[in-house]
A protein has these predicted regions:
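Conserved, structured core segments of small domains
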Residues: 1-98
């Protein structure tokens, strides 16, 4: 059986403050708290910011979380609602794993 995950990619939105790093952006603490709910519910496997200067990051849900649930959760993110971040959900086929 194929392991398909619906990965959330974040990038700076229209309310992103130029010259500020990710953790200085408005709403990022609430963004982290939002995804911590999924981590605590064991629905999030990995997540974090990109380390380049472009900002943004990604979240990798555990196997079995539907595209609809991932899309809904991503749209409820306070940083997405405020425009600090944009979220894109993309399907990802795990081709290699331990």
């Amino acid at each position: 059986m194929q392991d398909i995950r619906y990965v959330i990619f974040h990038k700076p939105g229209p309310a992103w403050l130029p010259g500020k790093v990710m953790f200085e952006q408005p709403g990022v603490r609430e963004h982290v708290a939002h995804y911590r709910k999924w981590l605590d519910a064991e629905k999030l496997e990995l997540g974090g910011p990109h380390l380049d200067t472009g900002g943004g990051g990604m979240m990798v849900p555990v196997a079995g979380v539907s595209e609809e649930e991932v899309t809904r959760f991503a749209s409820e993110d306070p940083a997405v609602k405020s425009g600090t971040l944009l979220a894109e959900v993309r399907p990802w086929l795990i081709g290699m794993s331990k």
